[in-house]
């Protein structure tokens, strides 16, 4: 089963390495390169998983530190495509369609471009796809071990990128709903699932430690200087968990913006995003493949 995914991983990594950034970059990628090298706190929402895995990547291996951080993105982009092929094969999809799906995703603009430089997306996608696989396996088998493993990966997914929060919420609540209701054991299993989820989110505690000890690069220190250049930091922004809460919920605004739900605006955003995905991302590659797949399905 794993021969085809291994081949996809090797080919994808070779392709990404052809265009990978050779050294230090700018903007968010430069920030992530520094964090991978020395640790610290990134801009909201903190992205602790990237920082922790990045520290491992920059500790071992050759080449300059900035390149190793770029290599992290390329490696996990290739690993995500390999995992996608393995996942689809396990779901009964043939080898050719599974590889076509990996090709469509792996050559889409955002996925390809973020595989070339230090970014959080490929690592986050890898963990999220693993969480999806294990969640479906847990729902289908009802096994407690798989359910707890899925809960852990769902928590870890949030440490990768908060963009997956809607998926995590739906998957987590579905797992909780499907826990067998067997008296007191039911409550025990629910609490165990919650504990597994919280355990997956423990990388966020690294942000608390890095902030309180002044370890590495700290975006929160920059916020302190920008908001209160001469006056002391107010008590409401001084406690570790208040600062962590701001990182996760503020959308990089101080004071944090309140959340509002406007159905028309949500519909417009969905429409705009769908158009961009169809025009610039998966659409140009996936549409011909979808037509070919539909034709084959009709022919058989």
Question: Language-model segments: which ranges?
Answer:
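Transmembrane-helix motifs of polytopic, lipid-linked glycan transferases
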Residues: 71-92, 130-134
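Hydrophobic, aromatic-rich transmembrane alpha-helices
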Residues: 277-300
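Membrane-interface transmembrane helices that cradle and orient dolichyl/undecaprenyl
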Residues: 89-92, 131-149, 154-157, 175-181
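Membrane-interface alpha helices of multi-pass inner-membrane proteins
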Residues: 35-38, 101-103, 146-161, 171-174
């Amino acid at each position: 089963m794993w021969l085809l995914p291994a081949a996809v991983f090797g080919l994808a990594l070779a392709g990404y390495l052809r265009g990978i950034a050779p050294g230090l970059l700018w903007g968010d990628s430069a920030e992530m390169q520094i964090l991978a090298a020395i640790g610290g706190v990134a801009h909201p929402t903190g992205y602790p998983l990237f920082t922790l895995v990045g520290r491992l990547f920059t500790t071992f291996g050759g080449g300059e530190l900035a390149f190793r951080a770029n290599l992290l993105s390329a490696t996990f982009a290739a690993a995500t495509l390999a995992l996608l092929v393995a996942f689809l094969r396990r779901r009964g999809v043939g080898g050719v369609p599974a590889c076509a799906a990996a090709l469509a995703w792996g050559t889409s603009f955002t996925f390809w471009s973020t595989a070339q430089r230090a970014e959080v997306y490929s690592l986050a996608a890898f963990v999220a796809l693993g969480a999806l696989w294990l969640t479906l396996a847990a729902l289908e088998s009802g096994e407690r071990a798989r359910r707890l493993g899925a809960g852990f990966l769902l928590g870890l997914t949030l440490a990768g990128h908060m963009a997956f929060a809607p998926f995590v919420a739906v998957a987590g609540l579905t797992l909780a709903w499907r826990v067998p209701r067997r008296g007191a054991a039911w409550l025990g299993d629910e609490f165990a699932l919650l504990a597994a989820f919280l355990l997956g989110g423990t990388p966020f505690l690294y942000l608390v430690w890095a902030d309180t000890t002044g370890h590495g690069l700290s975006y929160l220190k920059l916020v302190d200087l920008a908001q209160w250049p001469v006056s002391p930091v107010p008590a409401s922004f001084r406690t570790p968990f208040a600062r962590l809460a701001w990182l996760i919920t503020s959308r990089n605004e101080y004071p944090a913006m309140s959340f509002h739900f406007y159905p028309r605006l949500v519909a417009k955003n969905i429409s705009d995003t769908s158009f961009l995905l169809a025009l610039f991302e998966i659409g140009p590659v996936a549409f011909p493949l979808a037509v070919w797949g539909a034709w084959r399905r009709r022919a058989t």
